[in-house]
């Protein structure tokens, strides 16, 4: 379970909008509560190194490209949601699929491919059984149905509390030489999650 700071990248993802939209509380036609939902992704070290090289070459793709396959010797794809700012402080729920387990299930595949592929297969099976439902987003699908198909391919299942907040491990390495914009009174403010030039 990730219980540490992850300097990930906020990636545009449909569920970031649809989950926030689904959890919005309305009163008299006006939204009185709308949670902030973000999709953050932290690539593997080798992928970050490649991204830095790409930036260094002004985003010109290299002539020779390759996708790592069987060369991957260890890793896992930890996928889930960290629900924050409630009586439990933080709660992590998700899955942890190792490269070893994914290759045991389907040789020559990696954990990310496995998680995406089984989700698509489960959704396609639901679509075949429910052709009159029209266009749906992932949140519209019955999670019990999807997980019944997907769970054997998702690795270890995790659901447990965490004492993590964005300020738990906060240190100011340039104390006295910068002015970080953090809110120590309310750790759940978005500014406490941002990594800025002032940090």
Feature roles, as predicted:
Residues 1-199:
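C-terminal catalytic/substrate-binding lobe primarily of soluble NAD(P)-dependent oxidoreductases
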